[in-house]
């Protein structure tokens, strides 16, 4: 079913990838990948995103051959994170720090995420930003933002404003 789409067939049907993720990570290069569901479809987005996350994880883990203090930070930004929130991503979250893989993830609401991924997020994330949220999300996020912000604060936040919890130097 996936190979019926020319875009997907051209990507996954290659013998060798022309994208060297290790070089990108080690040399602080920028890689932008547009996996917009509107362009490639929901299933194709999930397939390619999952494959990419798995490759990024294995590439990050390969960097064990570089002493920790010499590893360069690599920053991964994932918009609409719920589309890629798999068991593999939960593992990436729990091991990212030791491989200097820094993650920034965005999504609309917490219940979009499987419970194991939610647990991995709140167990491993140092910094958190929140715009106005629903009552159910507010109660979950309040646990992360207390004693400074309450569930009521999160629900009544003005448009275009946000609350943050920032982790600096660990």
Label the model's feature ranges:
Residues 110-170:
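C-terminal regions of RecA-like/P-loop NTPase motor modules
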Residues 1-101, 105, 117, 154-158, ...:
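P-loop NTPase motor domains
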């Amino acid at each position: 079913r996936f190979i019926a789409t020319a875009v997907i067939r051209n990507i996954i049907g290659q013998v060798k990838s022309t994208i060297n993720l290790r070089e990108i990570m080690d040399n602080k290069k920028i890689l932008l990948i547009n996996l917009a569901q509107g362009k490639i479809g929901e299933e194709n987005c999930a397939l390619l995103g999952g494959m990419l996350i798995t490759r990024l994880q294995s590439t990050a883990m390969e960097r064990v051959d570089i002493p920790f203090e010499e590893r360069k930070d690599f920053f991964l930004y994932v918009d609409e994170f719920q589309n890629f929130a798999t068991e593999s991503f939960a593992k990436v979250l729990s091991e990212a720090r030791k491989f200097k893989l820094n993650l920034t993830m965005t999504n609309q609401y917490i219940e979009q995420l499987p419970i194991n991924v939610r647990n991995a997020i709140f167990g491993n994330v140092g910094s958190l930003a929140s715009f106005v949220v629903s009552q159910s999300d507010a109660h979950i996020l309040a646990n992360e933002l207390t004693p400074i912000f309450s569930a009521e604060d999160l629900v009544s936040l003005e448009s275009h404003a946000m609350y943050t919890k920032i982790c600096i130097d660990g």
